[in-house]
Amino acid sequence: MIDSVKLRRDSAADFFSHYEYLCALQNSVPLPAVRACLREGVLDFNADRLRGVDWAPLLSTLKINKDLPLVSIKSFFQPWLGDTGSDMNKFCRSRVPAIRYKDVTFQLCKALKGCLSISSVLKNLELNGLILRERDLTILAKGLNKSASLVHLSLANCPIGDGGLEIICQGIKSSITLKTVNFTGCNLTWQGADHMAKILKYQTMRRHEETWAESLRYRRPDLDCMAGLRRITLNCNTLIGDLGACAFADSLSEDLWLRALDLQQCGLTNEGAKALLEALETNTTLVVLDIRKNPLIDHSMMKAVIKKVLQNGRSAKSEYQWITSPSVKEPSKTAKQKRRTIILGSGHKGKATIRIGLATKKPVSSGRKHSLGKEYYAPAPLPPGVSGFLPWRTAERAKRHRGFPLIKTRDICNQLQQPGFPVTVTVESPSSSEVEEVDDSSESVHEVPEKTSIEQEALQEKLEECLKQLKEERVIRLKVDKRVSELEHENAQLRNINFSLSEALHAQSLTNMILDDEGVLGSIENSFQKFHAFLDLLKDAGLGQLATMAGIDQSDFQLLGHPQMTSTVSNPPKEEKKALEDEKPEPKQNALGQMQNIQFQKITGDARIPLPLDSFPVPVSTPEGLGTSSNNLGVPATEQRQESFEGFIARMCSPSPDATSGTGSQRKEEELSRNSRSSSEKKTKTESH
């Protein structure tokens, strides 16, 4: 039917255009029932209005479609719901729609499977009142398993039974997007409820594993974002009973994700309600548990269950609300209208008939009769050939433009205020429909007061809960105020202790400041500098062995921050030797200058000044000098060296230069010895020249 791949791709994005194209290929017109909601972007139609030839283009378009967010197919053809045998025979003689044939339902499920497999926008799938067989459900379950976007699935009024539900459960068990399912009126028993309870347990295990993985490294898992069912609707399945309720109670006790469970008209008793109430003691996430329309449950038990569920729903505003009863409908929509058939004529092509719906019988008021005005005038149909006959086609066209008749409000009020006016209430069940005529005390009249009483009870319970919370908060407030006063008292005590400790530390710091005085530290540093200067002089004088004998290490001769003084006694440089040779006699002045320059070290408050070693006369230890001095003067070199050493020791042992000048005799002896040495050296120099 499709010749090119490009056309197929374009058709998948536009359902309406492709549906028109396929209808044109088979020389048919798109059905108004199908086109009604396509302009809104959804596919919603009554399947009873389609013939067999109309399904082919529709299913071919649906199979490849990718742009429909909602697909809703309904069927209301139920011939077994007739009241009497004559009604049953009338329905059986009428035309059976094509959707009731197994081939059409099988092709429909195949098309839905293809749409579910490829569509990424299909979120709602509703099949209402269809007869789905086992092979149809198997194909549909495969599509549900492959769907990546389906959120809501409804098979309401589809008599699939427990076996069909088990097949569907295989498709929805691993779905990551499906949130709500609706199996209202599907002829389920407690076994079907057990299948759904097993699905809940399976998804709970998977969610617990995902929760554990998300809680690692101190993370907080988001339960609302996890996959799984959030609402299950099983209304109007009277065979579920207490066994099904107990199965759900067992799975709900450990479930943290299901938000709503609807069990209206499911044949529950006090035993099943009690099991659900015990499950609510541990389950605080279920916000809707609808067990209404179960007459075997006591009013007190139902009130306790609803109260517990309402307490769970107060924590946050839930998106899942309480649904209305599926069996209560407006009387105007469910009341059957009697029809009168008029045969206009018969011929070779058939007979023309007109079916006219007559209004219900109106009661006659006591006193006067209501006369109808011109706006209520409806002439009786006339047979053909009579004067004033109106063809039925002309009547139908006129009816389209006539609109609704004008009805006065006071007439309706007068009719409703009459004591004998009947009120028709329709009560539907999965197996039959009953029409009852009751007085003003019908269920529909008392439905509004019942709702208001439930709302008042809910408000009263909410008020009691708020008062209880207020009382608890007041007690907590008193405890907190008492604790605050205790903490303030402790804070004052700690502040006093801190002040006393700070004063003690301040007094102790004053004593420690004495050791931090710069004068004391400076005097200690000066003492060490003098000692190191003494060690440097010993080393420069060639008396390092004396320091070693005294137990002073060689590394102690170096003072940190000051350059080490090197000895020039052993090997005097040539320049100094020439300068000594060039010196002429001025013995007295040189001796006095040498006496002034020979000092250990001038100590100041900040640094020390090294001695001028170049002007310090040191006996030359070279062999030439020793030889010349011994040969010329006849004085052994050892004696001369001994004399210089004794004089040096005498100077070193003196406390200071001022102390040596105080003792005149010692100073004169030193001057004489130095003069003698200088004169002897000069003589040796002159002789050598």
Swiss-Prot record:
Pfam families: LRR_6
Ranges where the record places region Disordered: 432-451, 563-589, 614-689
Keyword Coiled coil: yes
Compositional bias (Basic and acidic residues): 573-587, 666-689
Residues bearing PTM Phosphoserine: S325, S327
Keywords: Cell projection, Ciliopathy, Cilium, Cilium biogenesis/degradation, Coiled coil, Cone-rod dystrophy, Cytoplasm, Cytoskeleton, Deafness, Disease variant, Phosphoprotein
Record's GO cellular component terms: centriole; centrosome; ciliary basal body; cytosol
Tissue: Widely expressed. Expressed in different retinal cell types with higher expression in cone compared to rod cells (at protein level).
GO biological process, one term: protein localization to cilium
Keyword Cytoplasm part of the UniProt annotation: yes
Coiled coil: 450-505
Localization per record: Cytoplasm, Cytoskeleton, Microtubule organizing center, Centrosome; Cytoplasm, Cytoskeleton, Microtubule organizing center, Centrosome, Centriole; Cytoplasm, Cytoskeleton, Cilium basal body
Recorded consequence of changing D290A: Abolished interaction with DCAF1/VPRBP
Known function: Centriole wall protein that localizes to mature centrioles and regulates centriole and cilia biogenesis. Involved in centrosome duplication: required for efficient PLK4 centrosomal localization and PLK4-induced overduplication of centrioles. Involved in cilium biogenesis and controls cilium length. Acts as a regulator of protein stability by preventing ubiquitination of centrosomal proteins, such as CCP110 and tektins. Associates with the EDVP complex, preventing ubiquitination and degradation of CCP110.
Subunit structure and binding partners: Interacts with PLK4. Interacts with FAM161A. Interacts with IFT20; regulating IFT20 stability and localization. Interacts with TTC21A; regulating TTC21A stability and localization. Interacts with USP16; promoting USP16-dependent deubiquitination of tektins. Interacts with DCAF1/VPRBP; promoting localization of the EDVP complex to centrosomes. Interacts with CEP350; promoting CEP78 localization to centrosome and centriole.
Family per similarity comment: Belongs to the CEP78 family.
Protein name (record): Centrosomal protein of 78 kDa
Organism the protein comes from: Homo sapiens (Human)
